[in-house]
């Protein structure tokens, strides 16, 4: 299977619903201004009512079971609906005593008044019929649902849905905006009709409204607030399911996509500006500033006191349309200086798509068409082609200022997801590399042999310490989509030869890896207790044991340790034969010095990769292997990771008990890093400067040129 590049996984947090503070601040931020007086008053009013909103939500939440059960008794017969309510587990420490609850309600003026389960008798029904606070209008076609026929599973789902409706009410009250009801309730009617009954659901919602409002009879303002949000809930439930928001296609190479209407309702509201002759001067100025922000990515009149000749007066007087105003801004010397002269043609096209169509390049074929146009006819022809396109006419027309068609505005393509999110950022003009073209080119080439979680997680394959290359490209926006079955290509190095290794690697004249193996000799005897096969061993004497210890330190730490950092107790035990080399490696790998150097200061993925190379002598091969180490590190910690590597069958087969770990495999990139091509070229240059054999070397004469 060929693994190619990915469209990117740029982190996106789509907005789930609107809130009063968020909507107000976003509107001011999008228009590059301070909040206006009306917006500040709205924020002030919202924050002043914050305690009341929290108290309302708390009372409804505390009595949610009663509210839901009363509504269920209205629409279900032949059983007890309360038995099917799924109650979440509540921490006893969070429960308040009844006295504290009554005291708080008395202080707030929200003492509970709830009707009995019998329904309140004749006068209660008369109040409902006259349209009081507890009025429930029975829709046509309503019939109570039999619990036995409906079934336990459907009962649980229905009561769960009623609890969700009530929860949405509390969320909307706290947020100060009913948008969360619009997003989550509109379109549910057709789904509920398949399992339940729409008239029954409407009766239940009205009963929940009446019961909830009854808890605030002493506070008319809170009661009206609750009723208003329930009215929005009922109105959105009755509304038909909205249609999908289709993305228009203007070429066969573009993706035809659809965005659910709920996503568009939840997204941040992006104002659309138009310039008409009937608008006031203030409105025209706001639209012109929006055009500057879209085309130049900033308000040039405010930030730099710059203007584009007399275009503003012409568009205000109706001499030119908004479309023509945008065209002339794109052809102005200022735009050419800012977004053409400093970039290569590929990046010029990418920025032009953002400024005039509000999106990124869709495909390589689309880029090729506009690149050919720019190369053949120049920059002005590119602007004309974008502004005169059918896409521009359908989205913006003659009067609308272009806007960014990003997340929530319309469906986004997956093949350019990451780079398009980057193009919409403020830092886009500072990126010189053509991101879209680079991505489309990577689609046609297999991925490089690199770390499955990004090339920046591979340390430089040198001896001294964990040095990782600095990455200028964010790994989240340029991921490596390796599958779980993809394995890295490793180059055999040292004393390991198998079907993956190549005999051509061991060339004549190269120095093989020196293997340190501690062979213990019985005292007073010449017999060897542990024989060495294939490689010379070091007998256990004081000098040779110190050589093994130094080799272990260099392999595990990458360098010799200072005297104060050495582990004297494990060294003595190794010299006395109390522990094996494997146990000695385990103890120095678990030392505080090693942990501080290669675990505490590194991300987990980098730490696991480096420790694996030091202890097992090779890089990790793929996601399956490194994910297993992630699981061990997360559940059992650092010491369990070291034990898992040293106790693995691979370690025992490769090194056994008495061999110091050594580098067995390296990556192709590491092999290229150690190449002697540069040294060979340097020697050739030096040889060319030496005098020929037998020639007499002359001293240069001073003063002659």
Swiss-Prot record:
Q: Where is the composition biased (Basic and acidic residues)?
A: 696-705
Q: Which intervals of the chain are annotated as region Disordered?
A: 685-705
Q: Where does the record place the PBS-linker domain?
A: 253-433, 514-691
**Region of interest: Phycobilin-like 2:** 146-238
Q: Which domain of life is it from?
A: Bacteria
| Pfam families in UniProt | PBS_linker_poly, Phycobilisome
CDD domains (UniProt xref):
PBP_PBS-LCM (cd12128)
Q: How would you describe this protein's topology in the membrane? A: Peripheral membrane protein
Q: Which UniProt keywords apply?
A: Antenna complex, Bile pigment, Chromophore, Electron transport, Lyase, Membrane, Photosynthesis, Phycobilisome, Repeat, Thylakoid, Transport
Q: Which Gene3D superfamilies match?
A: Phycobilisome linker domain, Phycocyanins
- Which residues are noted in the entry as (2R,3E)-phycocyanobilin-binding? 196
Q: Known post-translational modifications?
A: Contains one covalently linked bilin chromophore. This protein autochromophorylates.
Q: Provide a GO biological process annotation.
A: photosynthesis
Q: Which GO terms describe its molecular function?
A: lyase activity
The segments labelled Phycobilin-like loop in the record are 77-145
Stretch list, region Phycobilin-like 1: 18-76
Q: Where in the cell is it found?
A: Cellular thylakoid membrane
EC number(s) recorded for this UniProt protein: 4.-.-.-
Family annotation (InterPro entries): Globin-like_sf, PBS_linker_dom, PBS_linker_sf, Phycobilisome_asu/bsu, Phycobilisome_asu/bsu_sf
Enzyme class, one word? lyase
Q: What does this protein do?
A: This protein is postulated to act both as terminal energy acceptor (by its phycobilin-like domains) and as a linker polypeptide (by its repeats and arms) that stabilizes the phycobilisome core architecture. Has intrinsic bilin lyase activity.
Query: To which protein family does this belong?
Result: Belongs to the phycobilisome linker protein family.
How the protein assembles, per its UniProt entry?
Phycobilisomes of this organism are composed of a two cylinder core, from which six rods radiate. The core is mainly composed of allophycocyanin alpha and beta chains, and of three minor components: the allophycocyanin alpha-B chain, a 18.3 kDa polypeptide, and the anchor polypeptide L-CM.
Can you name this protein?
Phycobiliprotein ApcE
Q: Which organism is it from?
A: Synechococcus sp. (strain ATCC 27144 / PCC 6301 / SAUG 1402/1)
Whichever gene encodes this chain, its name is: apcE
């Amino acid at each position: 299977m060929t693994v190619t590049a990915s469209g990117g996984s740029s982190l996106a947090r789509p907005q789930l619903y609107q809130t009063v503070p968020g909507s107000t601040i976003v509107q001011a931020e999008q228009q590059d201004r301070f909040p206006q007086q009306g917006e500040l008053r709205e924020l002030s009013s919202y924050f002043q009512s914050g305690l009341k909103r929290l108290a309302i939500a708390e009372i409804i939440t505390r009595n949610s079971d009663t509210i839901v059960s009363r509504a269920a008794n209205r629409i279900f017969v032949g059983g007890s609906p309360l038995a099917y309510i799924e109650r979440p587990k509540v921490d006893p420490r969070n429960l308040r005593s009844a006295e504290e609850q009554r005291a708080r309600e008395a202080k707030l003026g929200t003492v509970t008044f709830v009707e009995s389960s019998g329904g309140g008798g004749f006068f209660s029904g008369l109040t409902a019929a006259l349209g009081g606070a507890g009025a429930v209008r029975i829709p046509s076609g309503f019939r109570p649902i039999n619990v036995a026929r409906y079934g336990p599973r459907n009962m649980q789902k229905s009561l769960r849905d009623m609890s969700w409706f009530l929860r949405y009410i509390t969320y909307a009250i706290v947020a100060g905006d009913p948008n969360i009801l619009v997003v989550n309730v509109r379109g549910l009617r057709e789904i509920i009709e398949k399992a339940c009954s729409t008239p029954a659901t409407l009766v239940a919602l009205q009963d929940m409204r009446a019961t909830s409002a009854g808890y605030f009879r002493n506070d008319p303002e809170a009661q009206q607030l609750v009723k208003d949000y329930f009215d929005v809930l009922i109105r959105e439930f009755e509304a038909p399911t909205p249609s999908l928001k289709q993305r228009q296609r203007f070429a066969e190479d573009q993706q035809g996509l659809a965005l659910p209407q709920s996503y568009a309702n939840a997204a941040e509201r992006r104002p659309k500006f138009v310039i008409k002759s009937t608008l006031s001067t203030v409105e025209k100025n706001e639209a012109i500033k929006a055009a500057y922000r879209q085309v130049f990515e900033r308000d040039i009149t405010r930030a730099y006191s710059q203007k584009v000749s007399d275009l503003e007066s012409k568009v205000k007087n109706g001499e030119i349309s908004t479309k023509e105003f945008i065209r002339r801004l794109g052809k102005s010397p200022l735009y050419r200086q800012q977004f053409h002269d400093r970039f290569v043609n590929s990046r010029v096209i990418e920025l032009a798509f953002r400024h005039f169509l509000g999106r990124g390049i869709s495909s390589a074929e689309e880029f090729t068409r506009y690149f050919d146009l720019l190369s053949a006819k120049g920059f002005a022809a590119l602007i004309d082609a974008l502004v005169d396109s059918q896409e521009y006419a359908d989205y913006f027309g003659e009067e609308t200022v272009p806007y960014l068609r990003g997340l929530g505005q319309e469906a986004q393509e997956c093949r350019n997801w990451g780079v398009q999110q980057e193009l919409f950022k403020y830092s886009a003009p500072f990126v010189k590399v053509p991101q879209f073209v680079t991505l489309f080119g990577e689609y046609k080439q297999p991925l490089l042999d690199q770390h499955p979680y990004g090339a920046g997680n591979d340390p430089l394959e040198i001896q001294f310490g964990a040095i990782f290359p600095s990455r200028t490209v964010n790994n989240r926006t340029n991921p490596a989509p390796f599958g779980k079955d993809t394995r890295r290509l490793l180059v055999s190095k040292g004393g390991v030869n198998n079907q993956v290794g190549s005999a051509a690697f061991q060339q004549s004249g190269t120095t093989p890896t020196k293997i340190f193996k501690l062979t213990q000799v019985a005292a007073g005897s010449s017999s060897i207790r542990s024989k060495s096969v294939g490689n010379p061993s070091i007998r256990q004497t004081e000098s040779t044991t110190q050589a093994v210890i130094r080799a272990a330190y260099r392999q595990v730490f990458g360098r010799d340790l200072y005297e104060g950092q050495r582990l004297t107790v494990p060294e003595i035990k190794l010299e006395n034969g109390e522990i094996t080399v494997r146990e000695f490696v385990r103890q120095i790998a678990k030392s505080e010095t090693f942990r501080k150097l290669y675990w505490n200061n590194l991300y987990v993925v980098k730490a696991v990769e480096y420790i694996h190379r030091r202890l097992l002598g090779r890089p990790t091969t793929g996601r399956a292997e490194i994910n297993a180490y992630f699981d061990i590190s997360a559940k059992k910690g650092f010491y369990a990771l070291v034990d898992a590597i040293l106790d693995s069958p691979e370690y025992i087969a490769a090194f056994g008990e008495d061999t110091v770990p050594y580098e067995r495999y390296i990556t192709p990139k590491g092999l290229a890093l150690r190449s002697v091509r540069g040294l060979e070229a340097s020697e050739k240059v030096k040889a060319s400067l030496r005098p020929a054999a037998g020639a007499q070397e002359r001293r240069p004469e001073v003063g002659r040129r």
